[in-house]
Amino acid sequence: MVTIKELLPYSYWIGHPVSNRAIVYLFVGFTPLTLETLHTLNYIILLNTKRWAPRSPHSDPARMRIPTQPRKAPL
């Protein structure tokens, strides 16, 4: 079985926070969680929550850019 410490490097690979919740449920049921383990899980969830947080449309300069040349037709 994978330990929680082994999951930390894969926090971005895990993806959406819903996946993290599933992993948390896996470990809560089968292993006693220490304080260090809880901090590690909290850190993984925070990383992914920030990654998937909705962004403001004003923060993306590419959306506000006016195209100067027409797009080329696909070949």
From Swiss-Prot:
Keywords: Host cytoplasmic vesicle, Host membrane, Membrane, Transmembrane, Transmembrane helix. Residues 53-75 are annotated as: Disordered. The chain crosses the membrane at residues 23-45. It is found in: Host cytoplasmic vesicle membrane. It comes from the Viruses. It is a single-pass membrane protein. Changing Y25A: Decreased virus yield. Residues 13-18 are annotated as: Important for viral replication in intestinal cells. Its main location: host cell. One of its GO terms (cellular component) is membrane. Changing P32A: Decreased virus yield. Facilitates virus release from intestinal cells in vitro, possibly through the host autophagic pathway. This is ORF2p protein.
